[in-house]
Amino acid sequence: YFIKTIHDVPSIVLIFFFYYVVFAAVQVGGIFVCIVALGVYTSGSFIKVIDIGLSQVDANQHYAAQMLGLSGWKKYRYVILPQAVKPMIPLFAAESKVLLRATTYAGYISQMDLVKVTEMIRKETYDMLVPLVFVSIVFLILSKLIVISLDAIYKKAFNYD
């Protein structure tokens, strides 16, 4: 129930909830609140991804591991997880990109993030095009790095495909 509730709430609402309700009595920075709020939000998403990956493994694989006499940990380590990780990697990449985009909400409660700096540059120079193009390129590069990293992990882990 917790995971479904957290995942159904928009990340910006969760950030505001943590900033104005959970951490209202404590003086903490907005960046810290964003890290905690987005960590909670992302953990719900990642748990769903793990659940999807584990559900993809056929029940007969569990029985086969038991028949081989593998303990609970060894069953998951050698039989279940190698098969479950493969469908998880693209989903982790997608969720990581969603998390990257959600970090732009940090500017609503903190003083410094990339989008907030862009706004400050616009106020000083009256030019919005160059800062927005720069921020877009930075986010594009970060997004591509996520995809390239997870692709490398995928290829290294499953080089037999």
Task: State the predicted function of each range.
Residues Y1-D161:
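Transmembrane alpha-helices and adjacent helix-loop boundaries
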